Amino acid sequence: DNQYGHAYGNAIIPDTYTIDLTGFCMPTPSTKITSPFGPRWRRMHNGLDLKVNIGDTIVAAFDGKVRIVKYERRGYGKYVVIRHDNGLETIYGHLSKQLVEENQLVKAGEVIGLGGNTGRSTGSHLHFETRFLGIAINPIYMFDFPKQDIVADTYTFRKTKGVRSAGSHDTQVA
């Protein structure tokens, strides 16, 4: 977690919101998840880690606008945050090199950086995070990494408890 990844402040979180996932592009050809989303050690791991080699090409998951290009020595290392028209933001962490600038428009599949091992990292990988209004959502609820595809054309964000189904997941909001 960092101050730059939460730009929505006091935004009102809707009870439900349908996110269009069409137009998605896998951020890397890698299908190997080396660390899943969820509690880890004494903190929450708000994304998942995909195995990449240093220098591997990392691409934008959707069309969007680059919001942040920064370096955090004890966090994401060199990272990029992209805001997308579908309501999501994606975060790409531990890059060896960032190849975009803040406010730059990017297309899905466009190269945004190179795989790396910067910041708080134990080996070369891509930390990939998906957020809606600053709330981290497990990427596997939207994307099937082994198949390199989306789970469904849409994902329904729900902030209240209920029944889970393909393409939706209940997210607890503090």
Which residues does each PLM region occupy?
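Surface-exposed, glycine-biased beta-strand/turn segments
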Residues: 1-77, 108, 158, 164-174
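Residue-level recognition of beta-strand microenvironments
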Residues: 36, 69-70, 98, 115-118
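Short, basic/aromatic beta-hairpin or loop at an interaction surface
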Residues: 37-38, 78-91
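Histidine-centered divalent metal-coordination motifs
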Residues: 47, 94, 125-129
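Short hydrophobic beta/alpha edge segments that flank linear recognition/processing sites
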Residues: 50, 79-82, 107-119
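Short histidine-centered loop motifs in beta-beta connectors
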Residues: 53, 69, 86-109
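Short aromatic-glycine-enriched beta-strand elements
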Residues: 74-81, 124-126
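Acidic, glycine-rich catalytic/binding loops that coordinate metals and/or anionic ligands
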Residues: 101, 110, 129-174
